[in-house]
Amino acid sequence: GWFSGVKIKSQDGPLGVRLIVNVVPNPILKKVELNPKNSVISNEYVDDIFNNYYGTTLNLNEFQNKIEIIKKRYEKLGYSLVRVSGPDRISENGVVTLKVSDGIISDVKIRFPDSDGEFVIDGKPRKGKTKDWVIKRELKTQPGSIFNRKILEADIGRLYATSLFDDVKVSLGPDNLNPGQVIIFLDLSEQRTGSLTGGL
């Protein structure tokens, strides 16, 4: 983890072949930057994690351990789709760039499956009795925002609290038009309404 390159040369000599090993050490770590800079991961937190390593020779094994600490913290905060990879780039002056993918939500699709789990009838999406705006007003999870599992769980709780739904299932899918982004599918089973009971 300490070296960025190793070159081995052989040289014939009177006593046989002599191996010359030249190692190129990693640069002194001066700064860790994020790409993109406006990530959910704060630069202050990254500096706190790497502060004790600034001014020392970069050790890529220790560096990867610190990246794991960052990933675990953000997963604990609910940002389970945040991906940190790298180092993406190591400059000669000791600035290391990490690539961050925040897990942006590109769309939230509401679906109403029938009893067989089908979403389409005669080539058209199956519609529910509940209007989309009634559902969307309960959702803090919105297109363009960063996926957060805790916020989505609270959204599901609010949907159940309306007493309009028997079941709420969530699935995630990739957005093929926007790599790195995700589509959230909300599959809603509506409560049966209008039941009448009576007796004598």
Which residue stretches match the model-derived regions?
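Periplasmic polypeptide-binding modules associated with outer-membrane biogenesis and secretion
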Residues: G1-L200
